[in-house]
Amino acid sequence: MGKIKVTPCDIKGLYVIEPTVFKDERGYFMETYNQNDFHEAGLDMVFVQDNQSMSVKGVLRGLHYQKQYPQGKLVRAVRGTVFDVAVDLRTGSETYGKWFGVVLSAENKKQFYIPEGFAHGFLVLSDEAEFAYKCTDFYHSGDEGGMAWNDPEIGVEWPIEEGMELIISEKDQKWGGFRDAFKF
C-alpha cells in the first residue's frame, strides 16, 4: 500500500526513510514498516524486538552499541522531536569514526536506519518525546557498550539550545572516548 522514500546518508549503510502519508479530514494513516517495501528498496533486515521510550527535553541517551550481538535499528519519534546520531565504528569503513545526525519528529515522520556496527544516541529537543525503535537483535544487558557523547575526537554537533539542561544517566556519563570504544 505505502511505498517509502529512502535517502542514503553520507555514511554508507545509513538511510533516512520517509513513509507515504495519507491525509484526509479524519487525520492521517501511514505504514511505519512494510517488509516488502523495505526489501524492494534493498533494505533486507529482519527485526526481532521493538522498543519505545519516553524522555523529557534535554535527555541525551547514548552513545550505545552491543559488542557481540550488534543491533541494527530503525528509529523514529512517535511524539515530539529528537536529534538522532550514529557514529561509524566499522574499522574497514571509509567513514570510520565519522558521525551523522538527523532531526526526527512526529511532524516530519522521518525514520532513520542504523545498521550493525554503529554507536547510536539521541537528544530530546521538545518538551517530551516518545521514541520507537525496531532492532535486528535482542537486547543483551551484559553485552552493552558505549562511548562518550561529547568526545572531541568525534565532535558530534549536538543542537544544545542556550540554557538547555542536559539530563544524562550516570552510566552514559562514564563511557570512555572513541579510542576506547569497541571496534567492529
Tell what function each PLM region has.
Residues 112, 120-125, 133:
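Short beta-strand His + acidic residue motifs that chelate non-heme Fe in jelly-roll/DSBH
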Residues 1-107, 126-128, 135-184:
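Non-catalytic, conserved peripheral segments adjacent to functional cores
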